Amino acid sequence: MSIETFTPTPLLFTPGAANKVKTLIDEEGNPRLKLRVFVTGGGCSGFQYGFTFDEDIADDDTVIERDGVGLVVDPMSFQYLAGSEVDYQEGLEGSRFVIKNPNAATTCGCGQSFSI
């Protein structure tokens, strides 16, 4: 009998995203906050990304630290986000956190929903 070990591909939390999270946390004045990214059903492609700030971290959450700030992902969302890049972009369409997900077969035009 052989046992295989599964090591999920981590998320990349870019310096730009971490810097924006730090700025927003400083504005809130609550150093316990972390950016939580999650996946829910919905959107025009089947799944959609969500972002919120959270103080509470569950035992089974994944926490990725960069430059003194944290990105938190629950286990259900992590399976859809493994190998993704979480970034922050500013442009003509506005400023927002974006996810570049190699697991997504299709994405909608706004980049907020996807299908596998």
From Swiss-Prot:
UniProt xrefs under InterPro entries: FeS_biogenesis (IPR000361), FeS_cluster_insertion (IPR016092), FeS_cluster_insertion_CS (IPR017870), FeS_cluster_insertion_RrpA (IPR023063), HesB-like_dom_sf (IPR035903)
Gene Ontology terms: biological process: iron-sulfur cluster assembly
Gene Ontology MF term list: 2 iron, 2 sulfur cluster binding; 4 iron, 4 sulfur cluster binding; iron ion binding
Cofactor: iron-sulfur cluster
Keyword Metal-binding found: yes
Database matches in Pfam families: Fe-S_biosyn (PF01521)
GO CC annotations, alphabetized: cytosol
Protein role: Required for insertion of 4Fe-4S clusters for at least IspG.
Protein name: Iron-sulfur cluster insertion protein ErpA
Gene name of this polypeptide: erpA
